[in-house]
């Protein structure tokens, strides 16, 4: 599976897992939300190990840009808050950084 697909799935798993904790602690949802939340966070960690990279830190750094874009998508689609110009500019810069890390000759 290509790295970008793994990063997309990892971001979805991480944001879903973190939102489960947010829902429990900030929105007053049942503690049962933590069960799928923890499973989702475990899936996130496992997915990042599937990226073909020699160093974990480089994998995490490249993933960071994808996570930012996925988080802003979640903000808009799940929470109904439209990202502003500054959100989108920051996401573009982060994605450019991720692309440099991923595509750099090694």
From Swiss-Prot:
Keyword line: Cell inner membrane, Cell membrane, Membrane, Transmembrane, Transmembrane helix
The species this protein was found in: Rhizobium meliloti (strain 1021) (Ensifer meliloti)
GO cellular component: plasma membrane
Cell location: Cell inner membrane
Topology within the bilayer: Multi-pass membrane protein
Family assignment from sequence similarity: Belongs to the UPF0060 family.
The protein, known as: UPF0060 membrane protein R01043
Superkingdom as given in the UniProt entry: Bacteria
This protein's record includes keyword Transmembrane: yes
Pfam families hit by this protein: UPF0060
Entry's transmembrane regions: 5-25, 31-51, 61-81, 85-105
């Amino acid at each position: 599976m290509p790295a970008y697909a793994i990063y997309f799935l990892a971001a979805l798993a991480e944001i879903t897992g973190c939102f489960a904790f947010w829902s429990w602690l900030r929105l007053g949802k049942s503690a049962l939300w933590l069960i799928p939340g923890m499973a989702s966070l475990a899936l996130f960690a496992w997915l990042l190990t599937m990226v073909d990279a020699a160093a974990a830190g480089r994998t995490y750094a490249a993933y960071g840009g994808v996570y930012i874009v996925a988080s802003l998508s979640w903000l808009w689609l799940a929470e109904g808050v439209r990202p502003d110009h500054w959100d989108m500019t920051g996401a573009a810069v982060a994605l450019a950084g991720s692309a440099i890390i991923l595509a750099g000759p090694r």
